[in-house]
Amino acid sequence: MKTQVAIIGAGPSGLLLGQLLHKAGIDNVILERQTPDYVLGRIRAGVLEQGMVDLLREAGVDRRMARDGLVHEGVEIAFAGQRRRIDLKRLSGGKTVTVYGQTEVTRDLMEAREACGATTVYQAAEVRLHDLQGERPYVTFERDGERLRLDCDYIAGCDGFHGISRQSIPAERLKVFERVYPFGWLGLLADTPPVSHELIYANHPRGFALCSQRSATRSRYYVQVPLTEKVEDWSDERFWTELKARLPAEVAEKLVTGPSLEKSIAPLRSFVVEPMQHGRLFLAGDAAHIVPPTGAKGLNLAASDVSTLYRLLLKAYREGRGELLERYSAICLRRIWKAERFSWWMTSVLHRFPDTDAFSQRIQQTELEYYLGSEAGLATIAENYVGLPYEEIE
């Protein structure tokens, strides 16, 4: 097999890159370890920045998102008996976010890829990357017991935190930055109307809570829990009781409860690896960085990586400017670190940390009061929440 760009991973970042490249006439093949149903079964993020919405539109996969996505012009933070709304649209110069589940984004991209006849190899086992620093890299993998080879010009590693792509870079070439948080999020998905038409983030003495949504009829709620908690110890009733205890009384009264479709506990971490490229291999999304979900940045950072890599590959193929690809990591990391900072900050001011003393607790409350009581502070949160601009590729 031969292609121009080999893409490892058929999650949203790999599929989005493949769709953009296909529209530009650049041949690509995606290799995915799992089945399509497994990929679609992952319950993930649902808040899309303006930049990602624009990129999906550019890729021609925005029809269902435009119809079913919920445009949010604000977000609310509750703390110390107060509720503060952040007017995202006004404070960011007209930008908004769109609530549209990652599963739906993935389904739209899968259907678009199938419709255009581009190649995706599912259940590709034992994937290995070779000759990354040479001019002719290639990928080997097994399918139905047969060992196959895929020759290519470039490889995009879009296979997530545990994927083979980052592992294919010599460890001594990479610098790892990491922070693991001492709690997780217990999330519940239910076919109940959302308690609010905008997201509510709550800082409460019992711990953080978030009221989110996937659609006008499907809600997603989270509560902060210790890492020692097990999801099987949480009945639906226990979850709803705990969630109500952490929300403002008037919100808790309106909360519609119901049976859970899914419950899971996700640990929180911040993680960045530098550089994000090695020879002709380029890492994108979770393969290179993880953010705690508090800032809704994980999927959106993957999209900005994909946008950067796509535009650099266009320059390489259309203008013969392959040397620009050497800038990929530096361009991506400038935006990534700002999103990492925002996600860390949101996590720090909204969660209750074990062993926090009275002074630190009062500082946390004052930090929220200052930012949410100041036009400049509100604008800073809004600018980051809707997403910082993508860097232009000259």
Swiss-Prot record:
Gene3D superfamilies assigned: D-Amino Acid Oxidase, subunit A, domain 2, FAD/NAD(P)-binding domain
Catalytic activity entry: 4-hydroxybenzoate + NADPH + O2 + H(+) = 3,4-dihydroxybenzoate + NADP(+) + H2O
Reported impact of R42S: 3-fold and 10-fold decrease of affinity for p-OHB and NADPH, respectively. The turnover rate of p-hydroxybenzoate hydroxylase results from impaired binding of NADPH. Hardly disturbs the binding of FAD
Residue(s) at site: Important for catalytic activity: Y201, Y385
Effect of mutating H162S: No significant changes in affinity for p-OHB are observed. However, the affinity for NADPH decreases strongly
Pathway assigned in UniProt: Aromatic compound metabolism; benzoate degradation via hydroxylation; 3,4-dihydroxybenzoate from benzoate: step 2/2
This protein's record includes keyword Flavoprotein: yes
Regions crossing the membrane: none
Effect of R33K: Slight decrease of affinity for p-OHB and NADPH
Domain of life assignment: Bacteria
Binding site for FAD: S13, E32, R42, I43, R44, A45, G46, V47, Q102, D286, L299, N300
Biological process according to GO: benzoate catabolic process via hydroxylation
Cofactor(s) needed: FAD
Record note on what altering R269Y does: No significant changes in affinity for p-OHB are observed. However, the affinity for NADPH decreases strongly
Stretches of the chain forming a coiled coil according to its record: none
Quaternary structure (record): Homodimer.
Function description: Catalyzes the incorporation of an atom of dioxygen into p-hydroxybenzoate (p-OHB) to form 3,4-dihydroxybenzoate (3,4DOHB). The reaction occurs in two parts: reduction of the flavin adenine dinucleotide (FAD) in the enzyme by reduced nicotinamide adenine dinucleotide phosphate (NADPH) in response to binding p-hydroxybenzoate to the enzyme and oxidation of reduced FAD with oxygen to form a hydroperoxide, which then oxygenates p-hydroxybenzoate.
Family indicated by similarity: Belongs to the aromatic-ring hydroxylase family.
Entry protein name: p-hydroxybenzoate hydroxylase
Originating organism: Pseudomonas fluorescens
